[in-house]
Structures are given as structure tokens and as C-alpha cells.
């Protein structure tokens, strides 16, 4: 109230404006840049993954979306916290011959940034033993991948260290990086095999031997 008993409307409006000024801005909607998202989901309904390899839309530029080395997806530097949405985006991933990764729908292709791998392998299923062993991995986006000739493993030596980074081909040119704990479990399954006169340490899966490193380098 003012001194003359009237309501101080201007003061109330000032408080509202001040509250609006300090309120955090609404989170950006990561689905906004993708006009063809509904078409992509409709194309795959009841049929598994969308056929992104058969779609050839025009390139519509890059968007501010990134898959971090820790497997977390970001849009405009904010984590995308809705796992179903991340899972949906992951089904639209395609890595082309140019080495770049895109989200692809029937009507658009947009570039995104990938810090390391497209997925993380977060659990491992082991069946059988020896050369009859079969390894399956589940990714952070719920893909299940059996390691075989079509889905090989590769081991990359880290720059400046003697460590190895293990990757699995999930589909197309998309790979999953094993988490450290899963890699330790994988190493426990390793055996030595002679290849072209040299002893290699590696693992078996689906009748294929996947060499990690020369046995001499790891003291075997």
C-alpha cells in the first residue's frame, strides 16, 4: 500500500519482473532441430531400427549435439537426461565415409560431434569356453551385440601410454567402447595364440580370435 492507502501495483509488477529475471531459462528441446523425427519413428515402428543406410536426404548442417567420451549425450552443452530420447536418437546415427557422424531422418541429415565412440559397452555376457566361446555386449543404449566376423573387436593403443582401448563394431561404422570394468573382465578371458609365427594375447568369440597385443609386450 502507498501512503494514501492505494495499492502499489507498480511495486508488484517490479517484483514479478525481478523474479522473471532470475528464473533459469527453459531447457532447450533437443528434438527441435529434427523435422523428420516423427517420420523416422513411423518408418521403424514394429520393424526394429530405422533404415538410415537407405535414406539419402540433403545435408542440413551441423547441430550443437555431442556424444561425450563418457557416453552422455549433450544438446547445447546440457546433458540429455531422458534415456528414451537418447535411445531414439541413437537409432538415427550414421557414420559416413567422410568419417563424420550424422543423425539421419527421411528428410534431413545433420552433423553431430562424437568425442570418442558412439556407444559404451556396459555389460558382457559370456557363453561357452575356449574357441567355442561367444561374447555378447549390451550398450548404454540397450543394443545387444555378439562379437563375430561381422561385429569384430579392435584394440587401439592410447597415445602416450601403454594402455589399450577396446572397441566393438555395433552396426554400420558405429562402435562401442568397453567401459574399464568390462575391459578388465574381458582380459580375464584372454588366451595366447600363435599367428604367423608370433604369439598374440587375445580373446575368442564366435569362432574368431581377436588379438589384443603381442604376448611379449604383456609379459606372457
Language-model features: where?
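Long, non-globular segments of proteins
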Residues: 1-220
Amino acid at each position: 500500500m502507498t501512503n494514501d492507502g492505494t495499492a502499489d501495483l507498480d511495486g508488484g509488477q517490479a517484483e514479478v519482473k525481478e523474479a522473471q529475471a532470475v528464473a533459469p531459462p527453459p531447457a532447450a528441446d533437443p528434438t527441435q532441430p529434427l523435422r523428420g523425427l516423427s517420420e523416422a519413428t513411423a518408418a521403424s515402428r514394429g520393424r526394429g531400427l530405422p533404415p538410415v543406410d537407405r535414406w539419402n536426404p540433403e545435408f542440413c548442417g551441423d547441430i550443437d549435439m555431442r556424444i561425450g567420451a563418457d557416453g552422455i549425450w549433450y544438446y547445447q552443452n546440457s546433458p540429455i537426461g531422458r534415456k528414451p530420447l537418447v535411445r531414439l536418437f541413437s537409432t538415427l546415427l550414421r557414420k559416413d565415409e567422410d568419417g563424420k557422424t550424422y543423425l539421419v531422418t527421411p528428410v534431413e541429415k545433420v552433423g553431430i560431434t562424437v568425442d570418442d565412440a558412439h556407444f559404451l559397452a556396459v555389460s558382457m555376457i559370456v557363453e561357452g569356453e575356449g574357441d567355442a566361446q561367444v561374447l555378447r555386449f549390451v550398450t548404454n543404449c540397450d543394443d545387444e551385440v555378439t562379437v563375430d566376423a561381422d561385429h569384430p573387436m579392435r584394440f587401439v593403443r592410447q597415445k602416450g601410454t601403454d594402455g589399450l582401448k577396446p572397441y566393438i563394431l555395433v552396426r554400420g561404422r558405429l562402435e562401442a567402447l568397453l567401459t574399464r570394468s568390462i575391459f578388465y573382465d574381458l582380459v580375464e578371458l584372454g588366451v595366447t595364440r600363435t599367428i604367423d609365427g608370433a604369439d598374440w594375447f587375445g580373446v575368442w568369440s564366435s569362432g574368431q580370435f581377436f588379438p589384443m597385443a603381442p604376448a611379449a609386450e604383456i609379459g606372457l
